[in-house]
Amino acid sequence: MNGSARKGNTLTAINAFIKGASEKNEIEIIEPDKLNIAPCKGCGVCQCSNGCVDKDDTNPTIDKIAAADMILFATPVYWWGMSAQLKLIIDKCYCRGLQLKNKKVGTIVVGGSPVDSIQYELIDKQFDCMAKYLSWDMLFKKSYYATARDELEKNKDSMNELEGIGKNL
């Protein structure tokens, strides 16, 4: 799940991960910024039916997430949190939360501050809470500091690390 609307460091990280993972796995990148998904209205109708009542890309997207064996959440840091694009999809997962239990997940977070800054900790905690609530097996959490568009790509150690994580799935 690519939480970035740009083709920058977050996508570079995803592609490095995919390079390692694609040998043994079928992979699809979901790009929320290219989908027509309305924000959750909190209407609660989804709790009595099998999905969201919005006639948009919500249900087909949640179907893909529910069918996946492993979910990678990748996001740039926006104001000490994940991107709005990624958060929108996560909010809409409420409509079928029980179908999303017991997934294997990993996170990649790319930001413009050193990786020991609070922004990464806050995002990790949010994903940890979701993982606990949905009984997810958190396989890995990786954070990277990169501000220039091609900065992460030039960091061979990071690229090798991400490819290795993908290979070891």
Predicted regions and their residues:
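Active-site rim beta-loop-alpha module in soluble metabolic enzymes
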Residues: A146-T147
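N-terminal beta1-alpha1-beta2 submodule of the flavodoxin-like/Rossmannoid cofactor-binding fold
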Residues: M1-A74, W80-R96, F140-K142, L152-L169
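Short, glycine-/small-residue-rich phosphate/pyrophosphate-handling segment
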Residues: L100-K141
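Acidic, low-complexity intrinsically disordered regions
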Residues: T75-P76, K132
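Short, solvent-exposed loop/turn segments at secondary-structure boundaries
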Residues: S117-Y120, D150-N155
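Residues in intrinsically disordered, low-complexity segments of regulatory proteins
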Residues: Y78-W79, S135
